[in-house]
């Protein structure tokens, strides 16, 4: 049986054309087998190595496939970008609204500092103001 296989191979080799470029000229560039760009890439090799190691360790059985993880990561990044764009759109409002906001903030600042001054005032001033209110209330009550 082994001899039959050898005979078939010999017949096949006889049918196949032999490359004649070897006999013509030794200066010609001889063709080489092309490399698969996917398998030749470093990232693909690292991914394959990582998958083999995880398979040997038994990891990844319950975890998500890499494609699903990448898709989720992209979706998450898209949501973050979308939120940032919405915030940027809110910031970049028309000039009229920006001016209204500035005026509103100025009015709030003008109203709030007197309250802040009262909070930071020494206690004897607060007591004195309380006494004035009491005395004015009692004088008004007397008038009634």
Curated annotation (Swiss-Prot):
Keywords assigned by UniProt, alphabetized: Actin-binding, Cell cycle, Cell junction, Cell membrane, Cell projection, Coiled coil, Cytoplasm, Cytoskeleton, Growth regulation, Membrane, Nucleus, Stress response, Synapse
Major subcellular site: nucleus
Induction text: Up-regulated in the hypothalamic paraventricular nucleus (PVN) and the CA3 region of the hippocampus of the brain in response to postnatal maternal separation or food deprivation and glucocorticoids stimulation in adult animals. Up-regulated in CA1, CA3 and dente gyrus regions of the hippocampus in response to acute social defeat stress or glucocorticoids stimulation.
InterPro entries: FAM107 (IPR009533)
GO biological process: actin filament bundle assembly; actin filament polymerization; cellular response to glucocorticoid stimulus; cellular response to nutrient levels; cognition; negative regulation of focal adhesion assembly; negative regulation of G1/S transition of mitotic cell cycle; negative regulation of long-term synaptic potentiation
Transmembrane segments: none
Pfam families from the UniProt entry: DUF1151
Region (Disordered): 104-123
Tissues in which the UniProt entry reports expression: Expressed in septum, the neocortex, the CA3 region of the hippocampus and the cerebellum (at protein level).
Keyword Membrane: yes
Assembly information from the UniProt record: Interacts with ACTB. Interacts with F-actin. Interacts with PRDX1. Interacts with COMMD1; this interaction stabilizes COMMD1 in the nucleus. Interacts with MAP1A.
Function recorded in the entry: Stress-inducible actin-binding protein that plays a role in synaptic and cognitive functions by modulating actin filamentous (F-actin) dynamics. Mediates polymerization of globular actin to F-actin. Also binds to, stabilizes and bundles F-actin. Involved in synaptic function by regulating neurite outgrowth in an actin-dependent manner and for the acquisition of hippocampus-dependent cognitive function, such as learning and long-term memory.
Identification of the protein by name: Actin-associated protein FAM107A
Organism: Mus musculus (Mouse)
Gene assigned in the entry: Fam107a
